[in-house]
């Protein structure tokens, strides 16, 4: 008997009642399930129409291909070829798997190295901040002189409120700095070169050439910049190249308290103004919301990061004011030539005519330490946003001095060709732009060598002051010719 479908001897023969043909049981059942018909006659057929055939057990005959030696050799050759092909495929798969595993191991090793480096940098930063906190909290009797600190009225209440605000602000900002790692994504040689090759656009011109110009970008939107030229206070809208005179009197100093509030110092008072700025443009400033009377002319004015206090300096005194009254003043036995507040707000530094830098605790007015002296009067001071760098320039030196507050030492001098005219450190503390009046320099901090590398030197003459506009990736500078220009 042979199966009508396969033509081979069936193992389980059955006969179809419909056609009378013999089939292999598994084959005919599959056909009926799919078509419900007999495969030979195409008549309707069900599984009940299949009748099993009982036959004695027998040895199935060999197929024709295995009945002769040549046929067997051919069969063996085919089997060998199949084994060889399968072995080749297995070897190829093994090679690919090894390559994938090797790539994965290299990627894992690189990831572990990056994690290790980042962990090390994090630990170094934490250790540096801890050392810095210890340094500013330790008062050395050999280096600290007793200062005359005069408190205002209601001493206890003022001191408690000031201390609480300073400590709260310090905790918030220092912890935020530990979590946030700022990187200048645009600080590449090509990007800086493209910035410096741009044609400067004029925002303002025909200013008095004998007076200096100071810039104060808004803390949240550097498109708006306060500009103090002589005793005239303007606000510059960088995006639209427009200006607005926001104060009619003679301004001696100014600063932003918040993005919508400014402080302006005159000869007899410090006035607080609401000054909302938005994308719709500049708005006029109304009457001051509060006014603080002062006894001496204020040369420098800085806002505490909380926006609730002001730090000021006259010729020989440093002051702290709330937005309503004076909290205390410190008498310094030297002429004060510059003032800067730490980004965390827990201390401030005064640059003196004798070249010294004196650090004071904001909450109490106690002197913490002093650096220097430099060889000439301190000209400008700027803390880095990383919390531990202090950039210093002097009147007569051609070097920019970088102090490290963690180590309480001068870590680097950046030389220029002639006396430093202006300097500005960007928000990442990794880009430093400066000018000696004839050349514009851009330096970048290289962490591997812990030094500053000069990225570019561009001839831009007559620069008297400059500042980074961080969000815009632009530079704003004034010239001795009485113009204010934007680069980028």
UniProtKB/Swiss-Prot annotation:
Subcellular location: Nucleus
Species name: Schizosaccharomyces pombe (strain 972 / ATCC 24843) (Fission yeast)
Catalytic activity: S-ubiquitinyl-[E2 ubiquitin-conjugating enzyme]-L-cysteine + [acceptor protein]-L-lysine = [E2 ubiquitin-conjugating enzyme]-L-cysteine + N(6)-ubiquitinyl-[acceptor protein]-L-lysine
Any one GO CC term of the record: cytosol
GO process terms (BP): DNA repair; mRNA cis splicing, via spliceosome; mRNA splicing, via spliceosome; protein K63-linked ubiquitination
Repeat as UniProt keyword: yes
Pathway: Protein modification; protein ubiquitination
Name of this protein: Pre-mRNA-processing factor 19
Enzyme Commission number: 2.3.2.27
Subunit record text: Homotetramer. Component of the NTC complex (or PRP19-associated complex), composed of at least CEF1, CLF1, ISY1, NTC20, SNT309, SYF1, SYF2, and PRP19.
Keyword Repeat: yes
UniProt keyword list: DNA damage, DNA repair, mRNA processing, mRNA splicing, Nucleus, Repeat, Spliceosome, Transferase, Ubl conjugation pathway, WD repeat
Protein's gene: prp19
Coiled-coil residue windows: none
UniProt record similarity statement: Belongs to the WD repeat PRP19 family.
WD repeat start and end residues: 331-370, 373-413
């Amino acid at each position: 008997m042979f199966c009508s479908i396969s033509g081979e001897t069936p193992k389980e023969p059955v006969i179809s009642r419909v056609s009378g043909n013999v089939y292999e049981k598994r084959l005919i059942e599959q056909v009926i399930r799919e078509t419900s018909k007999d495969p030979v006659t195409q008549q309707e057929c069900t599984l009940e129409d299949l009748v099993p055939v009982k036959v004695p057990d027998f040895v199935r005959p060999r197929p024709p291909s295995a009945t002769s030696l040549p046929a067997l050799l051919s069969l063996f050759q085919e089997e060998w070829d199949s084994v060889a092909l399968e072995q080749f495929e297995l070897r190829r798969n093994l090679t690919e798997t090894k390559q994938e595993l090797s790539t994965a191991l290299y990627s894992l090793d690189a990831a572990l190295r990056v994690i290790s480096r980042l962990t090390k940098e994090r630990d170094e930063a934490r250790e540096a901040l801890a050392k810095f906190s210890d340094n500013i909290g330790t008062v050395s009797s050999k280096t600290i002189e007793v200062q005359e600190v005069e408190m205002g009225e209601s001493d206890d209440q003022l001191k408690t409120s000031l201390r609480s605000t300073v400590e709260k602000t310090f905790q918030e900002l220092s912890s935020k700095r530990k979590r946030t790692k700022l990187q200048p994504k645009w600080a590449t040689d090509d990007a800086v070169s493209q910035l410096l090759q741009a044609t400067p656009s004029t925002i303002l011109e025909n200013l008095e050439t004998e007076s200096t110009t100071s810039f104060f970008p808004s803390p949240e939107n550097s498109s708006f910049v306060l500009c103090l030229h002589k005793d005239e206070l303007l606000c510059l809208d960088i995006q639209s190249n427009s200006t607005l005179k926001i104060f009619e009197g003679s301004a001696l100093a100014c600063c932003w308290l918040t993005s919508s509030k400014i402080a302006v110092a005159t000869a007899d008072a410090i006035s607080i103004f609401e000054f909302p700025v938005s994308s719709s443009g500049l708005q006029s400033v109304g009457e001051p919301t509060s006014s603080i009377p002062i006894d001496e002319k204020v040369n420098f004015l800085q806002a505490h990061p909380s926006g609730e206090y002001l730090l000021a300096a006259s010729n020989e005194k440093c002051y702290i004011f709330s937005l309503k009254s004076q909290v205390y003043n410190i008498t310094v036995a030297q002429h004060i030539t510059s003032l800067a507040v730490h980004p965390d707000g827990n201390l401030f530094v005064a640059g003196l005519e004798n070249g010294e830098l004196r650090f004071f605790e904001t909450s109490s007015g106690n002197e913490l330490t002093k650096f220097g002296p430099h060889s000439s009067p301190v000209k400008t001071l700027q803390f880095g946003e990383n919390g531990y760098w202090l950039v210093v320039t002097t009147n007569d030196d051609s070097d920019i001095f970088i102090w490290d507050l963690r180590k309480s030492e001068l870590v680097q001098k950046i030389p220029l060709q002639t006396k430093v005219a202006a300097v500005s450190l960007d928000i990442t503390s990794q880009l430093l732009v400066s000018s000696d009046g004839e050349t514009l320099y851009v330096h970048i901090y290289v962490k591997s060598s812990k030094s500053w590398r000069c990225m570019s030197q561009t001839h831009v003459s007559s620069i008297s002051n400059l500042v980074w506009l961080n969000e815009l990736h632009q530079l704003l500078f004034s010239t001795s010719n009485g113009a204010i220009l934007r680069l980028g």
